Swiss-Prot record:
Record PANTHER family: LONG-CHAIN-ALCOHOL O-FATTY-ACYLTRANSFERASE 3-RELATED, OS04G0481900 PROTEIN
Known pathway: Secondary metabolite biosynthesis; terpenoid biosynthesis
Residues glycosylated per entry: 176
Enzyme class: transferase
Membrane topology summary: Multi-pass membrane protein
GO cellular component entries: membrane
Similarity remark: Belongs to the wax synthase family.
Protein name as annotated: O-Mevalon transferase macI
E.C. number: 2.-.-.-
């Protein structure tokens, strides 16, 4: 056995890469600090220091390098989350004293006194405050939330939620497979019927994907909390888990589509900046009964809500473009959401001219079906041409056969990116 010359041996220096925080780390830090801010007494130096540090982390999330993730859909979702949380902080932290403003409802009449909570309970109160989106069980429950399911046992509810969870994943896998089939012909040049088919696939695919972004956690969590009676007390009731989306039957106008049928996850934080700005107006304007002033307040709030929603979604495209070294872009998000608000204003004006008033009355058959046709046509066209196509192109997705195929590919990668699809895994094993 050869002898080793110990005197000539030198230790090998391990190469280490310097650790640096990316935007995902700063997003998480900003959230943790937001939960910590209400733990410090209001008006103290500690409170202001925590708040300043929280704001710094929130801003740094938009400036630091994005996570090293090549998946466009994941990057987009992380960017939307960043924008969503900033809007949430503006509403529940920056413009108010949260422990004095936001209270959980103990029963139908009694709000919880947050100032009397112990330190551990106040921490979990703050964690819930910055986590919930629709204010269910709080004194700020948003309007338009769909009614809770008909009375059923908690085990029936849990089973139904898990079934929806499975169907959701099956729908995502179906979107992926269908998009692959439609895109499999490299020479396809869609005719008008083909266009309609692709439009429908894009809109339905996006709808299922958006639904999954909320349901992926809410469905199993609700089944766990209600079925096993675990978690916060308010989460253990079936009534605490109403559907994310309302009935399609309500979508006989563009206003009702966005107000009742579509999800309400962003409604509170999207409307908060506009409500705050309106509150700064003189009392004479705030309380004026003049029709012109009331209409100006109403439609200003409407437009500002859609603009903020556009900004939140634009953060997603911003995150993708800077991560992949593409030209910075909002992907048309601002235009798309602003035009939704303008469409509602135009619709209201048209109803006023025609003498149509849907408030408090059930529409007639003609009104309902004409409304369905107009709303569906507007939504499908705008969802594809004003959002799907521009976002896909901004993300660097191109197809020589046309922009519709680029949007279709965006739908496919978005559906595939949703984690934990056990239905797709089982399908691959079987087939």
């Amino acid at each position: 056995m050869a002898e080793m010359d110990v005197s000539s041996w030198k230790p090998t220096k391990l190469e280490t890469k310097p650790f640096s925080l990316d935007s995902g780390h700063y997003t998480a830090l900003a959230f943790v600090l937001a939960v910590c801010v209400p733990q410090a007494p209001h008006g103290t130096a500690l409170r202001y220091g925590l708040l300043l540090l929280q704001i710094t982390c929130g801003v740094q999330a938009f400036l630091a390098q994005p996570p090293s993730v090549p998946d466009r859909a994941v990057l987009y979702t992380s960017g939307v989350l960043m924008g969503n949380l900033v809007a949430r902080y503006f509403d529940r932290l920056y413009t108010t004293v949260p422990e004095k403003t936001f209270h959980r409802i103990i029963d139908s009449q009694t709000p919880e006194d947050t100032t009397q909570l112990s330190a551990p309970k106040r921490f979990f109160w703050a964690l819930e405050l910055f986590s919930v989106t629709r204010g269910i069980g709080w004194n700020w429950r948003v309007a338009g939330i769909p009614k809770s399911p008909v009375p059923i046992t908690r085990f029936q509810f849990a089973a139904a939620q898990l079934l929806r969870w499975t169907v959701m994943y099956a729908g995502l896998h179906l979107v992926n497979v269908t998009c692959q089939v439609v895109s499999s012909n490299p020479n396809a040049i869609p005719s008008l019927p083909g266009n309609l088919h692709i439009y429908a696939l894009i809109v339905c695919g996006f709808a299922i994907t958006i639904y999954s972004h909320f349901a992926i956690l809410m469905l199993p969590l609700s089944a766990l909390c209600v079925g096993l009676q675990v978690g916060p007390r308010s989460w253990q009731a079936v009534a605490s888990w109403p559907p994310n989306f309302g009935s399609v039957r309500e979508a006989y106008s563009i206003r009702r589509f966005w107000g009742y049928t579509w999800h309400q996850q962003l409604r509170r934080q999207a409307g908060a900046p506009g409500a705050y700005l309106i509150s700064l107006l003189p009392d004479s304007v705030m309380t004026s009964k003049r029709t012109a002033v009331k209409l100006a307040r109403r439609y200003s709030l409407l437009m500002m809500s859609f603009v903020i929603s556009g900004l939140i979604h634009a953060c997603g495209t911003y995150q993708v473009t800077r991560a992949l070294g593409l030209p910075l872009s909002d992907g048309g998000e601002m235009k798309y959401f602003a035009l939704q608000g303008m469409a509602i204003i135009a619709e209201d004006f048209g109803c006023w001219v025609l003498g149509i008033d849907d408030r408090g009355t059930q529409p007639g058959v003609m009104r309902r079906w004409m409304g369905y046709a107009i709303t569906l046509s507007w939504y499908i066209w705008s969802r594809v041409q004003l959002k799907g196509v521009p976002v896909a192109l901004a993300m660097g997705i191109e197809d020589e056969r046309g922009d519709l195929f680029a949007a279709l590919e965006l739908v496919r990668v978005s559906a595939v990116a949703v984690p934990g699809n056990f239905v797709a895994m089982a399908w691959e094993l079987i087939w």
